[in-house]
Amino acid sequence: LLKCNVKFIFEGEEEIGSPSLEAFCRTHKELLEADVILVSDTSMVSAETPSLTTGLRGLAYWEIEVTGPNRDLHSGHFGGAVANPINVLCKLMADITDADGRITIPGFYDDVEDVSHAEREMIAQIPFDEAKYKAAIGVDELFGEKGYSTLERNSCRPSFDICGIWGGYMEEGSKTVLPSKAYAKVSCRLVPHQDHEKISKLFEEYIARVAPAYVKVRVTPKHGGQGSSEERSVG
């Protein structure tokens, strides 16, 4: 018999940002009080390597809407004279990271602690086959922030991703349209000490500052969460 109480929480909204979880935990704070919390939504290094996860990256998520003309236009009549919202959106998104994989938003790295020498040594000891990793996901080359290994990039460093982008004509065949609107859903993975609300504000201010005057850009925050990291033995 266990000599302690065990409480289970089964939560099915994780993929949409867990909109109900925080309020539930606040309402039932006393019921959920515990000395140790174990999260099962993590992965193993490999099928042969037992893993204990001591930290997770946080998240900030937005939807972006770029509006140009008041309706879809014919590119033969208006192309080159009116800004194309999809072109503008692609340029805005492409400029958020530089050629070295670093995020260009001013202030973004202010609260980021670099990977320590001890952490790098510990990560380097993890059994990791880069060739198998690439083969499993079907890519020939990997890309990420310069100066960091693959395992450092996907665990200890922040990142920016376009999760979805759309606009204009997307049916079969072709249509020479200059679209009225373009949309994107984007996210940043954050590391501990990066506050997702602060990052969200920095992102919104950055887009407002660099967006050209010939389109209207609206940024809508969707959800976010703090990264976490626990004390661990290194060496």
Name every feature range the model reports, one short phrase each.
Residues 12-14, 33, 55-68, 86:
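Internal, well-ordered domain-core segments that constitute the primary functional module
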Residues 1-55:
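Acidic/histidine-rich catalytic neighborhood of metal-dependent amide-processing enzymes
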